[in-house]
Amino acid sequence: MPATLAVIGNVFPRGAERTKAIGIWSAAVGVGTVIGPMVGGWLLSHYWWGSVFLINLPIGIAGLIAAALLVPDSRAPESGRLDPAGALLSVVAVASVLWAVIEGPDRGWTSSAVLAAFAAGALLAVAFLAWQRRAASPMLPLRIFRHRALAAGDLLVLLGAFALIGTLFVAVQHFQFVLGYSPGQTGLRLGPAALALLVAGPLAGVLAPRLGMRIVAAVGLAMLSASSAVLATTEATDGYSRALVAMLLLGWGAGFVITATSDAIVGSLPETDLGVGSATNSAAIQLGAASGVAVMGSLLSDRYRGGLDDVPSPVPESLLDSAKESLGTALALAERLPGEAGTAFAEAARQAFVDGMGPAMSAGAGVTAAGVLLALLLAPLRGADTTGTTHQKDSS
């Protein structure tokens, strides 16, 4: 992803054409994110589970051929050396924090292992920043964050990816296990988000030069917040129509945020910094996605497990522990129980999951609502240069 965005910045250095190209790129990124579960669900419904991984082979080969034939060659005048120490510190720091967030509901948030992982992640993050300051060829030159558009864009796209991927993670389980759709049917019901992204990305590419990242990103984050709020207030008896509204808002919001921030990041940098600037954009998306799944998944799991603790059932304690691992496991267990007992336990498990969606999706709504305020406060005005000063008066 960093290379593709950098290539667009080189081919379309400035102006409306670059913004439109980034709008198409953003739509492709977002649509691919949603189409992946759709295709995976269809494959699981018709073929061996390994086909979900094998499908990437022909796609990768096609991409390799297309890159060799179609992508123009471009490189920085001076190529830096690799920074293995920086790469290792960053990976282990992020992995430590994510592990702590994921394991918190199971091991306990105050357990020694979880607290140690949080502490290790914080210390390693500080060590990473210190190393980047003194390294001769740092992986992430910290000077690049002096560009206001890049710093704000990375922060906002991270928050957007947090909500986008975290919501998809929860929605797939909701569609399949609460609403009762097959994997293939679940994938199809993610389709409206992909279609909305396909329209929103190019549209944001038209709006961004006129309104600026501040307005377009704020509107996108507001739509993402609304999408999360719709799912946060969903009841177990609600059908797909309510989720459809959330999917449409999700696609529109993601398209606006990814396009506006990516365009601002590329437009704020000189050609020599396009590679590392694009890499920060990609890293922000990936970090936001991983954090969204970890945080929202942990909140969902915590409430779901607590909900099953309060359910009077004929399920033995050992089997109940297995049911707490996932709603899918609980429903499989319910099928083994006799008559009304199985039906009652399945309904209770579904209700516990929907109850867990409340805090999980509220986290997504809260993060993106904060993102709206940050966009209005931190994002540069329309016409801002790389340091955040304006070339023309903002009419908005």
Regions found by a protein language model. Give the residues of each.
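Transmembrane core module of solute transporters
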Residues: W48, A85, T110-A117, L123-L124, ...
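Interfacial helix-cap and linker-helix signal at transmembrane-aqueous boundaries
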Residues: V39-Y47, V101, F175-Q176, L207-A208, ...
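Structural signature of transmembrane alpha-helices in multi-pass secondary transporters
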Residues: W25-T33, P37, G86, S90, ...
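C-terminal membrane-cytosol helix-exit motif in multi-pass small-molecule transporters
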Residues: P58-R75, A93-I102, G121-A135, L374-A379
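Hydrophobic transmembrane architecture of multi-pass small-molecule transporters
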Residues: A62, A264, T280, A284-A379, ...
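Helix-loop-helix hairpins in multi-pass membrane proteins, especially solute transporters
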Residues: M1-A85, S112, L195, T237, ...
